[in-house]
């Protein structure tokens, strides 16, 4: 008797022979029935049969809290008929670049003297888009207290996490921490970290429109901004999204040369 893959086993049968291991010897005159089949290999009892519940046992946990829902997980949920589940809403992330020297990459005019194109925002947006987060482009703020205050206000209004680049070092025009404390009554949890690149990375929290907001100030150097976005921004966004492993996998590696650490 022919059956399809995954179909129930006919009563009395105790083995399945794959069609590749058979040879059709005789059909009915109308070609609709297979009258005689040659089995090339002797089957064993239980061959190619899976017991009921062998894929997913009744009462088993198919997804743990903190699991990321991707294509495989959606298929698994569909298999068990789970059409509605509770999920954690991902945070909206506002990106704001700072610096008098920045020119928007969308500006098609020739690069102005003394300016550089703002590559950080494009890099961070692509990274966060790739991880499935909603991102708001809040433009570029100049090194001016009022302009930075206005742009930060807009970023806080539209996002749960505000990520800035530039303005966090020790220069006269590095104003982010000053504005956060004086204008937004923010709590600075750290303003320097023992790492390089990324030493001036800043983390602050504040309340805006009765909601708690997170601010991550990254260095303006593109390499530093990229490194710190992986070490701080992504884990922060994942933790707020309910990931059980916000930091991802840790891989040990051995470098083939000596590494001279910065004494600072």
Predicted segments with their positions:
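Short, glycine/charged-enriched hinge/interface segments at domain edges or termini
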Residues: 1-137
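N-terminal small/polar loop signature for handling phosphorylated ligands or for N-terminal nucleophile
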Residues: 122-185
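Short glycine-rich anion-binding loops that position phosphate/pyrophosphate groups of nucleotides
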Residues: 7-8, 100-101, 167-173, 220
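Flexible glycine/proline-rich
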Residues: 56, 179, 183-264
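Short acidic loop-to-helix transition motifs that present clustered carboxylates
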Residues: 46, 69, 140-148, 195-200
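Hydrophobic alpha-helical scaffolding
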Residues: 49, 67, 114-118, 138-141, ...
